[in-house]
Curated annotation (Swiss-Prot):
Family stated for the protein in its record: Belongs to the eukaryotic ribosomal protein eS6 family.
Biased composition (Basic residues): 223-238
Gene assigned in the entry: RPS6
Entry protein name: Small ribosomal subunit protein eS6
PTM remark: Ribosomal protein S6 is the major substrate of protein kinases in eukaryote ribosomes.
Record-level GO BP terms: translation
Organism in which the protein naturally occurs: Leishmania major
Length: 249
């Protein structure tokens, strides 16, 4: 079995090979993903360490899924974005049947991923005795403010983490990332213009609606007056016909 040990505090990861003799002395079925285990079960060099089980895969590469209480391979109906079904595959709302491993360890697990929760007495070479600094700093404006404890009125462009680019035969230069979600006067003006255009559009639509309703009302009023005039004309003609008939008698 291969064991990937990660130490997020130092940003280091290293893979170790665990022999079958060591695994025979351990009841792997007693552990599942999310549990904290004593590092001594993987060898005497990890004595005193506390590991948290994060993931793994079997010999065929099927990943372990948290929450599936099984020590064997199961077939799950999963949606896009789940373990085993990438987001860029399939259609929106589609579900597929995928084979995954349960969260319980077994003897046929080929790889286990763990993180260090508690450091032991002896350092692990390449994990706890070294530090891998982050190559890139934060890019989003809110995260830069959080890193340097800046207020919303301070300019974050002065605090961007720059890195030095070294190329043979060329002068060294500093490279900085483009700040995302940065609020500048240009952004404020664009948002104000967008809001102003939206308000003007609503007002123009309301004015057109009022004009349309006024036109409809005038047409209906003219139609009622025309109908009333026709009825009055028919009534007058009927009365005149009655008078003429009465006079003939």
């Amino acid at each position: 079995m291969k064991l990937n040990i990660a130490y997020p505090r130092n940003g280091t990861v290293k893979q170790f090979e665990i022999s079958d003799e060591v695994l025979r002395r351990v009841q792997l079925q007693d552990y599942r993903l999310g549990n904290e285990v004593d590092g001594a079960i993987f060898g005497s060099e990890f004595k005193g360490y506390i590991f948290r089980l994060r993931g793994g895969s079997d010999k065929d590469g099927f990943p372990m899924v948290p929450g599936v209480l099984a020590s064997s391979r199961v077939s799950l109906l999963v949606k896009r974005g789940a373990i085993g079904f990438n987001t860029f595959r399939g259609y929106q709302g589609e579900r597929r049947r995928k084979n995954v491993r349960g969260c319980v360890l077994a003897s046929d697990i080929a790889l286990v991923n763990v993180t260090i929760s508690k450091v032991g007495d002896q350092p692990i070479e390449g994990v706890t005795d070294t530090t891998a600094p982050r190559r890139l700093g934060p890019k989003r404006a809110s995260k830069i403010r959080k890193l340097f404890n800046l207020s919303r009125t301070e300019d974050v462009r002065k605090y961007v983490v720059r890195r030095r680019v070294v190329k043979s035969g060329k002068k060294d230069r500093l490279k900085a990332p483009k700040i995302q979600r940065l609020i500048t006067p240009r952004v404020k003006a664009r948002r104000a213009k967008k809001a102003k255009d939206a308000i003007a559009k609503v007002r123009a639509s309301a004015a057109e609606r009022r004009e349309y309703l006024r036109l409809i009302a005038s047409n209906r009023r003219a139609l009622r007056q025309r109908d009333h005039s026709k009825k009055h004309t028919r009534k007058v003609h009927a009365q005149r016909a009655e008078v003429a008939a009465f006079q003939k008698k």
